[in-house]
Amino acid sequence: GQIEQIFTNYFAGQGLASAPTDFDGRSDYGPFIEAGIPAGGLFSGAEGIKTAQEAAIYGGTAGEPYDACYHQACDSIQAPNNNLSDQALAELGDAAAHAIWTLGKTSTGFYADGSRMAASQAVSLDQFDYRGGQLVR
């Protein structure tokens, strides 16, 4: 989609390798896309195993998990267990900032009519009982 293309173009422009990943609802973006809100993001690996080709492109060790600490007690940015890659954080953080900037300054939306919201997904707040944590009806 359009968000993925923003990231792809950014990485290419920076001379950085990148690869698409499945956008399958596994993460916290599911409710956004269910509500018709465009979503996209970055992925640096989880419990998958790095291939020899990926190790040659991105570094690391073939046959090892992308993130051996994924959802484990050692998954921390606190010493002594800091398993955060400063390089990955810088590259992905810059890509995210670029995407936010690109989307924020555009005058067109994601839909065929140029809008920022799909007409079929438009919802009036008047039909909800709550606004934030406040009961309004």
Give residue spans per PLM region.
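Secretory-pathway/membrane protein signature
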Residues: 1-137
